[in-house]
Amino acid sequence: MKRISSVLFAVAGLCMASAISLADEAKIAQAVTPLPEDLRAEAGVYDYDDNGERLTYREAGNHVECQPRDENGFTTCTSTATAARRDLSAKLSAEGLSGGELQAALASAEEAGEVDPMPMGSMFYRAYDKDDRIQLLWVVFLPDAVSDVLGMSTLSQRDNSLAGKGLPWMMREGTGSAHLMIPINGTEISNLGGASMSLDTKAIEDPIKHATLPLPEDLRPYAAVIDYDDEGNRKVLRPGRNAIECRVRDEQTGFTRCYHRSLGAETDMQAKLMAEGKTMQEVFAAVGEARESGELTPPPLGSLAYRLYEEDDRLKLLWVMRLPNAMAADLGMPTGSQRDASLEGKGLPWMMREGTSSAHLMIPINGTELSNSK
């Protein structure tokens, strides 16, 4: 009888362990939903108890970790580089701190060297399970950044995002919590909707109106518009009143581009070299050398560039955040290409050329009248 009881106890223990394991597996699967596929399998999963102590469900095998859906319906993921900061925040919250008091305590911890500041350009991922908020949102933290310096819009896209066609926009500029909101349209967990039809951009004959199409509405009226003659000389079609400069469509490439005005000298150099008959490879090499020598000043870290293309064989509406010399692991960013998904109208942002002076975050814009169709 004693032996039978021992066997039954052991079996019950195995069943309980199996049940806990299955529960943890379900929690892990749910927690990684905000991430792109290439980060999910090795992302860490954790939570906090009522005392603010960390509970680990799966150790991180890459540079991202996720917290399961909370009582407010949010599932979040972020860089493992910010773990110490989040752990401290959880303990302070458990002690009753919130709002300004909590932020002040974190700032004091930064000054004391107890936690690192939020890295410039670090990524945060959020999923929400109802349609009254943005359901899939990625955020790039840009502490103390100002929209005009980075060439960003501050016009809220919340309503457009709920309709499946929101554009990125900056919030809380000039503060320690400044960030770029990137609503993700077009995926299976995004808000439903999107533009009902595409805009016939080729029918737009006004060169200034066409040149500013890649921009959000609030930046278009104030952007400079330029072109180049056959000898590579700059022609100003409209002076600018913000940080953005747009170039009319390049008939050879089909691209219409807008960028931070600090890149003007670089585009001037490229135009001159192209007019001299240099190949693209030679132009890129010359520009690279000029950057290294300091002849060309790089654009601010985090600044945006905007590109429109009007055929279906490439990303039609693409925004690019410049992150010179940044590494994906430091910022919690993915590097898996989303080109094919973007052509289908459901691409996610991804980093390219990490660790180089031309490192950048590709931000395909889905769901708008200028975007690739599903």
Question: Each PLM stretch: what is its role?
Answer:
Residues 1-9:
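Bacterial N-terminal signal peptides that target proteins for export
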Residues 9-17:
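Bacterial N-terminal signal peptides
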Residues 18-23:
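Sec/Tat signal peptide C-region and signal peptidase I cleavage site
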Residues 24-374:
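Primary mode marks residue(s) on the alpha4-beta5-alpha5 output face of response regulator receiver
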